[in-house]
């Protein structure tokens, strides 16, 4: 089968190459998926660029969609021919979705309705499940107003839609060029984080009340809200990333005396019940008829280098997907 792989870290144009590899055979509890689309996420390009790996080569990408071609032992044969989307395809595995086929545990191939195309479904795994779990966590808090950072990102765009559908007043951060995208997704206001002080603008937009929660993609930047009245007492920060992965100082006094809650999660490591709940929310969201998946580029498999470069540039206004 045709596969995209890298055997060392580096620039996309220097390390990505196509190779022919044996078609996988589904093992006990697995399904073999003939892939139609492979989603390219920021975590995929970061892994290729510089994260150590334990294999002699890696076939990248965790998200994808296609059709089940075969099943291994202890999997219902009725699944053959089923349209599915795949999550965690390459998490702690050698073979991801940048290939013509992938064998994964049956639970990692989720049923896909006929109404949803493969390119859209290839955006569900990391962006969709991250957003769904974040909003599930939000649902456990008393929240009327929520700040969504990176609201024009693939994850943030889903979060804005889901939270606004739940009746929350959503304030998003985004560049001026992407503000309309965030407003169309359901945000009441957009803060240009490049030109405006986020904390001060929150207070202005809420008449000094602040927000009850933050769903955050970059704790390095957002941590300063811990000590700001822009985040109300008894507020919650739900965080799934940070541009600085080192030590980030926060004022314990403010955490304590404001009775703040910090919730962090990695979408790859959700507990089984958390994953199931996220899949359920994402499915309901997609069936609502209101869901919007913003796809910036759909490229042929042969243009994988360009896809990685687009994601790395930050200039893609939406998801980047490869047709396999």
Each predicted region: which residue ranges?
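Short glycine/proline-centered loop/turn elements that form peptide/ligand docking sites
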Residues: 73-74, 172-181, 220-223, 245
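Mid-domain Rossmann-like dinucleotide-binding core that forms the NAD(H)/NADP(H) cofactor-binding site
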Residues: 122-195
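NAD(P)H dinucleotide-binding glycine-rich loop of Rossmann-like/cofactor-binding domains
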Residues: 15, 88-150
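Glycine-rich phosphate-binding loop and adjacent beta-alpha segment
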Residues: 221-291, 324
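Short amphipathic alpha-helix with an adjacent loop that forms part of the alpha/beta core around
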Residues: 198-208
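Glycine-rich beta-strand-centered segment in the early N-terminal region that forms part
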Residues: 22-40, 49-90
């Amino acid at each position: 089968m045709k596969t995209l792989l890298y055997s060392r870290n580096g620039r996309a144009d220097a390390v990505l190459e196509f190779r022919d590899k044996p078609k996988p055979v589904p093992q006990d509890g697995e399904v073999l998926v003939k892939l139609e689309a492979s989603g390219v996420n920021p975590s995929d390009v970061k892994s290729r660029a510089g994260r150590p790996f334990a294999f002699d080569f890696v076939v990248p990408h965790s998200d994808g969609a296609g059709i089940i071609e075969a099943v291994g032992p202890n999997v219902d044969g009725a699944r053959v021919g089923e349209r599915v989307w795949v999550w965690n395809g390459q998490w702690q595995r050698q073979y991801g979705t940048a290939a013509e086929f992938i064998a994964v545990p049956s639970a990692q191939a989720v049923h896909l309705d006929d109404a949803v195309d493969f390119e859209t479904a290839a955006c569900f795994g990391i962006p969709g499940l991250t957003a769904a779990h974040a909003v599930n966590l939000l649902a456990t808090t008393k929240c009327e107003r929520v700040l969504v950072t990176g609201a024009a990102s693939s994850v943030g765009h889903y979060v804005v839609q889901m939270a606004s559908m739940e009746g929350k007043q959503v304030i998003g951060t985004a560049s001026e060029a992407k503000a309309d995208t965030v407003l169309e997704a359901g945000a009441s206001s957009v803060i240009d984080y490049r030109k405006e002080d986020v904390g001060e603008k929150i207070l202005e937009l809420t008449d000094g009340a602040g927000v009850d929660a933050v769903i955050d993609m970059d704790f390095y930047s957002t941590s300063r809200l811990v000590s700001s009245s822009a985040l109300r007492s008894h507020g919650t920060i739900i965080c799934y990333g940070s541009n600085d992965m080192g030590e980030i100082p926060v004022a314990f006094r403010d955490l304590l005396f404001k009775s703040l809650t910090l919730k962090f999660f990695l979408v790859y490591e959700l507990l089984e019940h958390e994953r199931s709940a996220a899949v359920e929310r994402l499915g309901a969201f997609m069936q609502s008829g209101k869901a919007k998946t913003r796809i910036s580029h759909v490229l042929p498999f042969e243009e994988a280098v360009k896809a990685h470069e687009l994601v790395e540039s930050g200039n893609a206004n939406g998801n980047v997907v490869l047709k396999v």
